[in-house]
Amino acid sequence: MAPLREKFVEADAFVIAAPNYFSGMNASTHALLERLYQFRHREADTLWGKLAVAIGVGGGDGLPVTDQIEGFMGYNFIETIAKVSGQGAACCFTCGYGETCKVGAIHMFFGPGTKITEEITPAVEKQPEVMQAAVDAGKELGRRLSEGHDRATVAARMQQQMMEKYKKST
């Protein structure tokens, strides 16, 4: 984390993306986001009030990942301004056993006997709504940054949201 530490501090915003493995983000991204804890109690001089975009892609969808990323950002009082979720190809499409495996994604999504073809292989490039959501997220992030968002206001709003969340859980 040491080489990335200053990059996190210097960044105006974050675009965090991860694959969906078993309804959660992969371990590498999870470990990276856990390391943000070192900034948590440093008041507004490091990460508080910054902006983020969360991106998740999975064999089914990326929504569980975007929700997790948003959660990590919230704990650090970083506002997630957009979440982009898409469907990518599960590893079953390339493992070599996808057409015959009875417990894999090919069998579950398309039924027994399905042949893997380019036409049925999911890819975010084939999902115009996902690609547009990514473009829109980038534009919104650029707009917010160019308008000089107030980090203190963002941090205060994020703190309030976190306090409300904890009130509901007690």
Residue ranges and their predicted role:
Residues 84-170:
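Glycine-rich phosphate/pyrophosphate-binding loop and the adjoining helix
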